[in-house]
Amino acid sequence: MTDDPISPSMALLPAGLRDLLPPDAEHEARVVGRLMKEFTRHGYERVKPPLIEFEEGLLSGPGRALAKQTFRLMDPISQQMMGVRSDMTLQVARIAATRMPKSPRPLRLSYAGQVLRVKGTQLRPERQFGQVGVELIGGMQVEADAEVVLLAASALAAVGADGVTIDLTVPTLVPTVCRALNLSEAETRCVRDALDRRDTAAVAAIGGPAGDLLVRIMAAGGPAAAAVAALSAVDLPTVAEPDRWRLTEVVKLLTAAAPHLNLTIDPVEQRGFEYQTGLSFTIFARGVTGELGRGGRYRSGGDGEPATGFTLYTDTVLRAIPGPPPPRRILLPHGTPYAEGARLRDEGWQTVAVLEPGADLSAEARRQGCGHLWAGGRIQEIQDRP
């Protein structure tokens, strides 16, 4: 305790950072625990990477795509630059490559933790938020792609998310097509910008076979079944066939395993998939602003081991599920034997002990947010509870 007055400035936090208060902090912890339990049920084992790593390791390889979002600081001990993680996926990939290289493949790992980014976005102004996810490392099969999509759907269902849509994409498709058509770097940048804006006229303005083909690819989006049919009718360059084949096969597996899963396809989406190397996906929920998570295929470690996985964002997930139920809090009068309180806690009650005699117990129960009172060896409900 301190006698120093509390300055109003002490309540100010940097932009994009916030305190999570009761009951929301407890609710978040329970939701994260339920998600992790679902991952464990599917054979994924938890790892825990550090919050800060040396910059050289954190931002090497695919990590270069995250450099602009990474806070940096000098380590006073080693005098080397360090980075605060802005994403946990590549940390888990590093663990697989350096700590578990001899573990049997495919390797299934899960994780949960906080990340910090230099800037927020329009849809996610928070700069610190929680990530919960899995990585399946060492599996190139289409079954691996389908497994992580189905796990994301089942984990969200386990915490009560409703109206979930999974939007599939192949962020390597458009770059592959542009290279096959011998488009220049400047033309490819124009294509990417136009596709990001969903500007069909700008794409068509490229002209020639390239413009026509890219417009057809762009138009082949929507519900999965129709999108696969439309994309199959497009005359793609031979080098782009593997991307289309994988997308088609994964949709078949997902449709067979979960026919009621709401699947869509956006074959030209690339934003946010800077280090993905194949089939990827974004997760949305009806009525919720922003994405619940995203995932996809990438190359893990220095040897480029094939991997896929997904990350859920806890702040958005919490907006997509029911709020916390009212707590079962009971007030214990001063002097209540410890054993009685222990028995109530074993029965699922949250006990709040009165620390001094003489209190108005009903008033104290209301003040402490308790809906019940332990009196005379019985549980009494408080009327006009808070």
From Swiss-Prot:
GO (cellular component) term, any one: cytoplasm
Cross-referenced InterPro entries: aa-tRNA-synth_II, aa-tRNA-synth_II/BPL/LPL, HisRS-like_core, HisRS/HisZ, HisZ
SUPFAM superfamilies: Class II aaRS and biotin synthetases
Keyword DNA damage found: no
Subcellular location field: Cytoplasm
UniProt keywords, alphabetically: Amino-acid biosynthesis, Cytoplasm, Histidine biosynthesis
Domain of life: Bacteria
GO molecular function, one term: histidine-tRNA ligase activity
GO terms (BP aspect): histidyl-tRNA aminoacylation; L-histidine biosynthetic process
Pathway it works in: Amino-acid biosynthesis; L-histidine biosynthesis; L-histidine from 5-phospho-alpha-D-ribose 1-diphosphate: step 1/9
A Pfam family: tRNA-synt_His
PANTHER family linked: HISTIDINE--TRNA LIGASE, MITOCHONDRIAL-RELATED (PTHR43707:SF1), HISTIDYL-TRNA SYNTHETASE (PTHR43707)
Note: This function is generally fulfilled by the C-terminal part of HisG, which is missing in some bacteria such as this one.
Assembly notes: Heteromultimer composed of HisG and HisZ subunits.
Reported function: Required for the first step of histidine biosynthesis. May allow the feedback regulation of ATP phosphoribosyltransferase activity by histidine.
Recorded family membership: Belongs to the class-II aminoacyl-tRNA synthetase family. HisZ subfamily.
Protein name: ATP phosphoribosyltransferase regulatory subunit
Organism the protein comes from: Rhodospirillum centenum (strain ATCC 51521 / SW)
